[in-house]
Amino acid sequence: MLNHVIVPASDGSLHSGQSTYGDMCMHLGIISSISVQQSFPPEYSLLPGTAIGYPFLCDSVSSTFYTLGAGLRFSALLPAMYAYLLVVAGAYLLFEVWLGRGGAATLALYLFFVGGGFGFAYFFDLSEAGGGGISQILSGFYTTPTNYTDKGIYWVNPIADMLVPQRATLFGWALLFPCLHLLYRAAILDERRLFLPLGVLAGSLPLVHTHSFLALGVISLVLLIANCLSLRGGLRLFLCYGLIAAALAAPQLLCFTFKQAASGSFLRLHWNWVNDKDSWLWFYVKNMGLIFLLMPPALACARRESRLFFAGGALLWLICELVVFQPNLYDNNKLIFVSYALMCGLTAEFMAKVWTALREGALRRAAPVLAAFTLTACFLSGGLTLAREYVSGDHLGLGGWVESGYQVVSAQQRRLAEYVSENTEPDAVFATATNHNNAIAMLTGRSIVCGAGTFLYYHGLDYQPREAALKLVYEQPAEWLDFYAQEYGIDYLLVSSHERGSWAVDEEYFAAELDCVYSDGDLALYSLK
């Protein structure tokens, strides 16, 4: 994480790692704009005038530090590092209360965070087609054993592809795992007094991570039904938990989430998640590997409590195989991976039982060898993915510091951002290209007319009219600049390599008709005032 968030390079540019090259830009824009523009509810700086329905609390916590004077990098990293520790600690405590102290809980933790499928086989293929080996993994862009879409590998590593780049998932899991811990103790171990604090924690989830709130709700519903069927008692406190959570969550859902999710692209039917190349069974065998193959015997040998707890995860998985909850089909993994965490717990419990039986049986001498092969198959894909993610950013190598990260902001654009921060109004609106790594939107907290469609589309936002307007502004300014400047409140217009790469920019018109307030090489910033 430390080498993935706008790392200053020796040439003055800012670098990122592979997984943060995309999403980080949007999150930094939200962090900086909440602090600089100080409006509530906050608006998208990538689409001015549109309230943010996305769970923004994961970013507003960093905005607090930025407002207090910390740098943008420090403000983004400090809460994220703390949240990451909470995720790991919360997951371990969940597995510990479920599986008991010892090897099973630790194994479950590693299976979840480092485990992977058989994707490594594509890189060590001995056939004529061959494989690129470790060099391809460590140097390719998203060609890892857990994220190789050309081969149908989508079972990403939770650390590299979810916790590091996806701040909402990171902060959501920081609350979700403690909630699951409390739920297990309250609903299965009958520590019913814990339903009340669980309701408060659960009710705080929607504006942190809506997917985590939904996942917790499904698992809780299954346990509630089981409680009713078994007539175990405690139904009143279980219902109190639900009422508290619903009362706290309702304003968040009604005022933010549901408004943005009203688009038809959010909720729709779809079978088999992202699989478009393989049969259902083979897709999960190669993506999840031994963890998937061991599930049937693990379920058969599991304790009643383990089967009951996993039942909610199984229902959640089934729902995710049938329903898509957001425009991006891939993002269903934010729900599926909650089921996967419970699957890892169930599998670890079974593997611990098998290990004990082998050590005490006739195969005790072969047990270490069998364990080594099993653990290698479980952890090789995830381990190689984490190695790739580390070297994809600027990092400490054997020969010293290596600047191998992806340039997300050039030195020229960084200087522009410094000028804008110091010399323009906080509520100024800029006409720029719609590149995702827009320095003004990322680093200054100012708004741009229209941001990257790769962000806005997956948030269910209608950005196409603004995108079309920008083309007219840059290519036919004599006819359209004044009209759209008034329509969208444009204060400044930028001409740089990004704009030239997007449109046939009429630079002669801008140079003759507008006041250039800042220039740096081939970059020029014009004022429309």
What are these regions (language model features)?
Residues 359-529:
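Extracytoplasmic
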Residues 108-111, 200, 232-254, 290-298, ...:
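Hydrophobic alpha-helical membrane-interfacial segments at the cytosolic entry of transmembrane helices
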Residues 183, 192-194, 215-243:
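Perimembrane helix-loop-helix junctions
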Residues 193-202, 219, 239-243, 303-324, ...:
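Transmembrane alpha-helix segments characteristic
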Residues 81-84, 169, 214-216, 328-357:
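Hydrophobic/aromatic-rich transmembrane helices and adjacent perimembrane loops
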Residues 1-175, 210-214, 403-407, 434:
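Active-site lumenal/periplasmic loops and adjacent helix-entry segments of GT-C-fold
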Residues 178-186, 219-227, 287-307, 350-353, ...:
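Hydrophobic, aromatic-rich transmembrane alpha-helices
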Residues 160-163, 182, 194-209:
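Membrane-interface alpha helices of multi-pass inner-membrane proteins
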